[in-house]
Amino acid sequence: MSGKNEFNIFKHVLVPEHRILSEEEKKALLEKYKITPAQLPQIRASDPAVKALGAKPGDIIEIKRRSPTAGVYYYYRVVVED
């Protein structure tokens, strides 16, 4: 045991699902909306969810949220250096 407290951030009820898009998914997303990664909202590499996923700068994260009024919706963020 490392002596370090381990906490799985994704098991918390308030943290939505996160995943890293594959290169094919990333390309399809950017083409669909006719945008560049620089036009996406940013998320820092030091964000606990990004660290838990092992994402690196340039990766695009898909975040799946649930809403009682809107149902399920997705949004995307590009990982940037701190």
From Swiss-Prot:
> PROSITE patterns attached here?
RNA_POL_H_23KD
One molecular function GO term is: DNA binding
What does the organism's lineage look like at the top? Answer: Archaea, Methanobacteriati, Methanobacteriota, Thermococci, Thermococcales
Q: Name one Pfam family in it.
A: RNA_pol_Rpb5_C
Q: Which domain of life is it from?
A: Archaea
Reactions catalysed = RNA(n) + a ribonucleoside 5'-triphosphate = RNA(n+1) + diphosphate
State the protein's name: DNA-directed RNA polymerase subunit Rpo5
Q: Describe its assembly.
A: Part of the RNA polymerase complex.
Q: What does this protein do?
A: DNA-dependent RNA polymerase (RNAP) catalyzes the transcription of DNA into RNA using the four ribonucleoside triphosphates as substrates.
